[in-house]
């Protein structure tokens, strides 16, 4: 047999065998790796430590001690989470929304990231004017910004991804966010709901620039103008965008329910996507509730009639927010 013909046959055969063996080796090594967990992080701001039926106060021996306010609420899902997992009774958040969110995203407290109040418009403070009390000159009115952000340049708006020019006159901290770190580890990252990391028309207003692959309804706003779908979730600066194409307006879907449905749709799409199905996911689930305004969901109206104690649903413990009879 012609030696050149043998070589011509053997070389592609050996190359193919080597590639198959290499692919099998990679597949085997991946199979041997410990399976990374999916992560769903729920964040609720403006919620007091007693605004749930799960008690956080403990006796000296560690026994849970329900308070009067704990007895006003029925939150069975939180009770289930408390029984199945760990309850931290000495962990504290910031007393206002933006600083807490910026801390969770960055791993820094407000003394380091310099965000000490809620944010909205670029370079504009939300502090009330006072003759004696002055805000620190270097606190970040623009919130946190993604790593690599410059004082001026071009950025993408959240949701529409339209490009705009921006310029920040005030100081701002740069952050390599948690989703960016998880993305580097092979996670598919999803943001759903309230973002409120950076001021309007800054890079920090766009969750995708912090490392999220997908962004559902997250912008610079901290609270919705309205929770009702029939009101199109409000208008003006506090309108919740990105939910107007799924019959939520027509069906008067409560905002909390709409966001939950959108998150489930995204998880289902990931499961069906061959490029993402085998990857772990990180879902940052941040409903706008219980932030103002106080609105009762249609599905919960009338519950007060069948409960022995006063009960509130969307915001705060005051009686004016209770479910109407």
Question: What do the predicted segments below correspond to?
Answer:
Residues 1-9:
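Bacterial N-terminal signal peptides that target proteins for export
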Residues 8-18:
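Bacterial N-terminal signal peptides
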Residues 26-86, 195:
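Active-site-proximal N-terminal segment of extracellular/periplasmic enzymes that hydrolyze or transfer
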Residues 51, 258-271, 309-325:
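A long, amphipathic alpha-helix that forms part
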Residues 58-63, 101-110, 201-217, 221, ...:
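Aromatic- and acidic-residue-enriched segments that line the glycan-binding/catalytic groove
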Residues 59-101, 107-112, 188-190, 213-219:
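Short, structured active-site-proximal loop/turn typified by the sulfatase FGly-forming signature C/S-X-P-X-R
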Residues 63-71, 163-171, 315-325:
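A short acidic, glycine-rich active-site loop
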Residues 120-188, 195-296:
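Formylglycine-dependent
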């Amino acid at each position: 047999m012609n030696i050149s013909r043998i070589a011509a046959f053997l070389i592609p055969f050996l190359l193919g065998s080597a590639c198959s063996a290499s692919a099998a080796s990679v597949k085997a090594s991946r199979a041997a790796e410990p399976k990374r967990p999916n992560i769903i992080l729920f964040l609720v701001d403006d919620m007091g430590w007693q605004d749930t039926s799960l008690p956080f106060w403990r006796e000296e021996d560690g026994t849970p001690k329900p308070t009067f306010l704990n007895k006003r609420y029925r939150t069975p899902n939180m009770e289930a989470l408390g029984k199945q997992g760990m309850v931290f009774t000495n962990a504290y958040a910031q007393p206002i929304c933006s600083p807490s969110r910026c801390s969770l995203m960055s791993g820094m407290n407000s003394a380091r990231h310099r965000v000490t109040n809620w944010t909205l418009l670029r370079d504009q403070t939300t502090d009330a004017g006072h003759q004696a009390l002055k805000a620190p000159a270097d606190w970040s009115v623009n919130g946190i910004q993604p790593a690599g952000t410059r004082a001026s340049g071009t950025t993408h708006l959240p949701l529409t991804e339209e490009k705009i020019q921006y310029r920040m006159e005030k100081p701002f901290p740069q952050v390599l966010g948690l989703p960016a770190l998880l993305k580097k580890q092979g996670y598919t990252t999803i943001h759903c709901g309230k973002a409120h990391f950076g001021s309007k028309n800054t890079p920090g207003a766009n969750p995708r620039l912090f490392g999220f692959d997908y962004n559902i309804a997250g912008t610079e706003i901290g609270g919705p103008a309205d929770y009702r779908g029939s009101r199109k979730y409000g208008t003006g600066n506090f309108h919740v965008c990105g939910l107007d194409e799924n019959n939520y307006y027509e069906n008067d879907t409560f905002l909390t329910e709409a966001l939950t449905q959108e998150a489930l749709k995204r998880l289902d799409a990931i499961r069906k996507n061959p490029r993402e199905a085998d990857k772990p996911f990180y879902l940052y689930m941040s409903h706008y509730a219980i932030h103002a305004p106080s609105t009762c969901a249609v599905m919960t109206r009338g519950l007060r009639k069948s409960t022995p104690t006063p009960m509130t649903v969307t915001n705060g413990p005051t009686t004016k927010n209770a479910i109407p009879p």
